[in-house]
From Swiss-Prot:
Family under the similarity heading: Belongs to the UPF0162 family.
Role according to the record: Required for maximal expression of sirC, not required to invade host cells.
Protein name per the record: Protein SirB1
Protein species of origin: Salmonella typhimurium (strain LT2 / SGSC1412 / ATCC 700720)
Disruption phenotype: Not essential for the ability to invade cultured HeLa cells (the invasive phenotype).
Annotated gene: sirB1
Length: 269
């Protein structure tokens, strides 16, 4: 099994990195099905979209296929948020998150030689393409709609701060490894809320491959271990966080949790 730390995310499609991470977390992840389905969509797109069309026309046709004929859409009807993040489930149900829908669309677009790239906007992942004339086109991966600067500023003011401003670097191409880390963070939170603690632990372990000494990730792993009633390991992880980040406002709460676990161990013994 390849390691996430050794994988060159930026030299591979985003889907490849997501599939590798998924294989490490879910023993039942159907890698072959996902690749077969991605290839099927590429073939359908190649049949429908003429290479003689302009770049803009090809992209418009791809968006019409993806969100129209193929029916990909956002995850409003999905019962469990984690189902909107796993590529196999998104390909089956056609409902996903910005990252999962964006990754599938990027896979197809790049196979058609359309230079679509991911952007980690402060509120969600968006997609960007530059025309041959140098004009930038921004796309919302939830629905394929074009985004203008006014819409992005409204998102910033509504979600970040009423005084937030849009900067050029907000629209820079994202590092694939960073997209994967953000996806795994969201997946871990979703699995914890869904009480799928064993899977959440595997996500935490995957995230630690990027930065094995990250105190915040070690803290989260400790909290998951505590939920799984692995108190001894939980104490080790939570204590590490408190030692590394004594000034962090959440440290006081973690200290209280450490005391609760330690007291529970004394009572049990």
């Amino acid at each position: 099994m390849r390691s996430l730390a050794d994988f060159e995310f930026n030299n591979a499609p985003l889907c490849d990195g997501m599939i590798l991470a998924s294989e490490m977390i879910r023993l039942d992840f159907p890698t072959q099905f996902v690749y077969d389905e991605l290839e099927r969509l590429v073939s359908l797109a190649q049949e429908e979209i003429s290479q003689l069309l302009s770049q803009d026309e090809q992209l418009e046709k791809l968006l019409a296929l993806f969100y129209g004929e193929w029916g990909f859409t956002d995850s409003r009807g999905v019962y469990r948020l984690s189902d909107a993040l796993w590529l196999d489930k998104v390909l089956k149900k056609r409902q996903g998150s910005a990252v999962s829908l964006g990754a599938i669309l990027l896979w197809i677009a790049n196979r058609l030689d359309l230079p679509l790239v991911p952007v980690i906007f402060p509120t969600q992942l968006i997609l960007r393409i530059e025309s041959l004339e140098g004009e930038m086109w921004l796309i919302n991966p939830f629905n394929g709609e074009t985004l203008d600067e006014h819409t992005l500023e409204v998102w910033l003011k509504g979600n970040i701060s009423p005084v937030a401003e849009l900067f050029n670097e907000d629209l820079d191409e994202a590092d694939n490894a960073e997209v994967i880390r953000k996806l795994l963070d969201t997946l871990k939170s979703s699995l914890m809320e869904e009480r799928q603690m064993e899977l959440a632990l595997r996500v935490s372990e995957a995230l630690l491959q990027f930065n094995p000494e990250d105190p915040y990730e070690i803290r989260d792993r400790g909290l998951i271990y505590a939920q799984l009633e692995c108190e001894h390991v939980a104490l080790t992880d939570l204590s590490y966080f408190v030692e590394q980040c004594p000034e962090d406002p959440i440290s006081e709460m973690i200290r209280a949790q450490i005391n609760t676990i330690a007291h529970k161990q004394i009572v049990l013994h």
